Amino acid sequence: MAQFGGFGGWSAMDVAAAAAAALGNVSGAVYHADPAAAVYASLVPGMAVVPGRAPPSAVQIEAARRWKELEKMALRSVNLMVTCAGAIQAGDYAAAAGSLSDAREIFAKMPTTRTGIGRVLTHFADALAERLFPAFPQSAPPPPPPRGEQRELFRGFYEAGPYLKFAHLAANQAILEAFEGCNSVHVIDFALTDGIQWPSLIQALAVRPGGPPFLRITGIGPHAAGNRDELRDVGLRLAEFARSCSVPFAFRGIAADQLDGLRPWMFQVAPGEAVAINSVLQLHRLLVDQDAAAAASFPAPIDGVLDWVASMNPRVFTVVEQEADHNKSSLLERFTNSLFYYASMFDSLEAISRHGGGDGAGNPLAEAYLQGEIADIVSREGSSRVERHEQMPRWVERLRRGGMTQLPLGATGLWQAAMQLREFSGAGFGVQENGGFLTLTWHSQRLYSASAWRATAGKKMTMMASGAADAMEESQNSNTNGGGGGSSGGGHGALNQIMQ
């Protein structure tokens, strides 16, 4: 089992088991921690007494003693932070503040919180502190980082490990297979960001037997800030790359803050185009509290988006999401589940660093990226909480209910993902095929799952009336906007069409 480099052999499973033990409940169904699988080494690596060998030296014995002290400190910290989360949930803020203060006192005595369990617990303590002592009024949640900083964090996380690389490869392979034999293809990307996913697809289409198709990409992204139109900038870069690969290409950007505000007519799908819709780590942002969803009489945002996705009848709808359970209404359950998950994430980042000859500190941008997710999960509630990760079984149920049928990600995708992980072969990553899905794993912990879908045949028929209504709405908007392209958010449309 993988171990944190900074704190005496503590693994991600150890963190989860300790958190569950603090609650007096180690049910795997709730906390995903199997106590039997937790490993608590009693000696520093290399300290085991083997017959025929010399007994441990005084230096080794002292190291073991210090290690045991650190182990006790880490366990005590986990217990205090779980107690803090439980007190917050119960409304006992004085007790919560006391537990958090005690945990921070322990952190101050630790030799380092740059690596290992100390680093993970520090991020969770910061999130609890933000929950207890918000720096902003309750009516105004903390604003997201500036857009330039968000891009930098995204790029840092992408480069730090196989996480987003796996997501893009699995999705692109499914799209490539869906476009086989098509001469005009259209990719709709729910979150274009810096367009880093698409050069590899363009390259694959360039060498396709029979020649490349005409490729159109519609990217959804933020509104232009100041004098800079980020969507257009990304489109220009993609157009130049497609030109270098001799792939006929067009780009269109749609500025939108919420996916549930979009409608099919906005994408201007041409007759005869084969459509692929791509969602990487975006659908969970459309979810609401599980308890609230069960009690609500109106559909959640995710339901409306899945309806119009199905109505567009794409050849493939690619979905990649965190393989995690962070959408519980209970803060205590969210806290323990996320502590387990992010302990594995930071463990894997440290292993990558050490595998590459580093000190285990890892990529600071990737750390900040994950820290932002932790803060959202732990410190925010209601509409301000967007990192609502759920596990694949719930996504399967939701997507099928939304009129989608699963397309298996076959052996080719599995082989390519495994080949991509060769760079990290010594770090403990793997790829599993689970019922047609591909899952990136860190030892036994599942991190991200990729899946592919298409509209169910019966659903297509029920959506015909919706399609006619969309066509009428498109006509009305074209008349209102003077034929400006029908993109949401204004400022994008004909001006954001970039063609080779």
From Swiss-Prot:
Pfam families recorded: GRAS
UniProt region (VHIID), positions on chain: 154-219
Primary localisation category: nucleus
Any one annotated GO CC term: nucleus
InterPro entries listed in its UniProt record: TF_GRAS
Superkingdom: Eukaryota
UniProt KW keywords: Gibberellin signaling pathway, Nucleus, Repressor, Transcription, Transcription regulation
Region annotated Leucine repeat I (LRI), chain positions: 75-135
Chain span(s) of sequence motif LXXLL motif: 283-287
Compartments (UniProt record): Nucleus
Ranges annotated as biased composition (Gly residues): 481-493
Ranges where the record places region Disordered: 466-500
Region annotation Leucine repeat II (LRII): where it falls in the sequence: 233-265
Tissue: Expressed at low levels in leaf blades, leaf sheaths, rachis and flowers. Expressed in the embryo of immature seeds.
An example molecular function term from Gene Ontology annotations: sequence-specific DNA binding
Sequence ranges assigned to domain GRAS in this UniProt record: 68-454
Induction remarks: Induced by treatment with gibberellin (GA3).
Residue span of region PFYRE: 275-376
Coiled-coil residues: none
Region (SAW): 379-454
Locus of motif VHIID: 185-189
Function summary: Probable transcriptional regulator that acts as a repressor of the gibberellin (GA) signaling pathway. Its repressive activity is weaker than that of SLR1. Its overexpression prevents the GA signaling pathway and induces a dwarf phenotype in Arabidopsis thaliana plants.
Protein family according to the UniProt entry: Belongs to the GRAS family.
PANTHER family in alphabetical order: OSJNBA0084A10.13 PROTEIN-RELATED
Annotated protein name in UniProt: Protein SLENDER RICE1-LIKE 2
Protein's organism: Oryza sativa subsp. japonica (Rice)
Name of the gene encoding the protein in the UniProt record: SLRL2
